[in-house]
Amino acid sequence: MPIVKVRENEPFDVALRRFKRSCEKAGILSEVRRREHYEKPTTVRKRAKAAAQKRHAKKLARENARRVRLY
């Protein structure tokens, strides 16, 4: 859990903004959304595999685009 110490004469809005930013960097909200409902292990693996395939296709597309532009 991110900890934000309120500085002397610091407005509440500024401290709240710093806290929100630190929570975002820590990935707390995305973790809460991910754990909101139970997801079967097979579904987790299937989603991870699909994401890996998408990353690989994106990488290949970038490499092919780079090769075309060189000459």
UniProtKB/Swiss-Prot annotation:
Region of interest (Disordered), ranges: 39-71
Alphabetized Pfam families for the sequence: Ribosomal_S21
Any one annotated GO CC term: ribonucleoprotein complex
Bias (Basic residues) ranges: 43-59
The keyword Ribosomal protein belongs to this UniProt entry's keyword annotation: yes
Keyword rRNA processing: no
UniProt biased composition (Basic and acidic residues): 60-71
Recorded superkingdom: Bacteria
UniProt-listed InterPro entries: Ribosomal_bS21, Ribosomal_bS21_CS, Ribosomal_bS21_sf
GO biological process annotation, one example: translation
Keywords associated with the record: Ribonucleoprotein, Ribosomal protein
Gene Ontology molecular-function annotations: structural constituent of ribosome
Stretches that traverse the bilayer: none
Similarity comment: Belongs to the bacterial ribosomal protein bS21 family.
PANTHER family reported for this sequence: MITOCHONDRIAL 28S RIBOSOMAL PROTEIN S21, SMALL RIBOSOMAL SUBUNIT PROTEIN BS21
HAMAP family: Ribosomal_bS21
Protein name: Small ribosomal subunit protein bS21
Species, as recorded: Vibrio atlanticus (strain LGP32) (Vibrio splendidus (strain Mel32))
Lineage, top ranks: Bacteria, Pseudomonadati, Pseudomonadota, Gammaproteobacteria, Vibrionales
Designated gene of the protein: rpsU
